[in-house]
Each structure stands twice: as structure tokens, then as C-alpha cells.
């Protein structure tokens, strides 16, 4: 599971995923990429399941880049606990993904195989996605 080795603060303020991405908007490393069409918090388990879905469909020659990382911890208070008495304990790690962010990239295999792998990865994610080609205007 992806999570940071160290963080300066254990419990950050919630970061909004509304609006469009400022960076990470084009395919830089691979030939095809998976772009988010809407914003969300993508947790480490969802990133991992998408990574597994891609790597199952890629041959050993294929290369994959994961362009997002879960830097932010989400907290949760235990069940049936009264309000107040501080913030809850960290429960999971999430990546803040805004609309237009390229999340995964693939190279070194045929175009049909790349599209199939990215489609399978998109099914594992809780947001609408689209497959983009390198150099394509977004």
C-alpha cells in the first residue's frame, strides 16, 4: 500500500478537490495516459487495485508510471463516540485528484493492449476517466 514514510503533520486540514488541475495535465512519460474527468480523493487501495489491473494486462515489455501519490491522511472518529474531544485518528491515505490530472501512463506495448489496460484501471477508480494520447490537446 502506498503511504508516505514521514509527514510533518499527522492530521492535515482537508484539501479540496474542486476545480481543474494546475499541473500534471499531459502525458509526459508514456504513450497513453488515464486522465481524471472529475475531482475526488483516491485512496491508496484504489491506486493499488488500478496498478494491479494494468500490470496484469501489460506484458513484461510494458512500462507503467503512477503519477499520483497518497500524501494526505483522512481521519475518522470511532463509532458511537460523542462529538468533540479532538480530531479522530488517521484512517487512510488519499491522493487529491482534480479534474484534468493524468494518473497513470503506459508505454512499450501495442495500442490496443494499452487501451484495454487503462480501461480496466479506470473501472477500479471511483471517478469518470478518459484515455489520452501523448501530444493530444486536452
UniProtKB/Swiss-Prot annotation:
Keywords linked to the UniProt accession: Ribonucleoprotein, Ribosomal protein, RNA-binding, rRNA-binding, tRNA-binding
CC per GO annotation: cytosolic large ribosomal subunit
Keyword Nucleotide-binding: no
Disulfide bonds: none
Keyword Aminoacyl-tRNA synthetase: no
CDD domains named in the record: Ribosomal_L16_L10e
GO annotation, biological process: translation
Superkingdom of this protein's organism: Bacteria
GO molecular function: rRNA binding; structural constituent of ribosome; tRNA binding
Family affiliation: Belongs to the universal ribosomal protein uL16 family.
Description of how the protein assembles with itself and partners: Part of the 50S ribosomal subunit.
The protein, known as: Large ribosomal subunit protein uL16
UniProt source species: Ureaplasma urealyticum serovar 10 (strain ATCC 33699 / Western)
Gene giving rise to this polypeptide: rplP
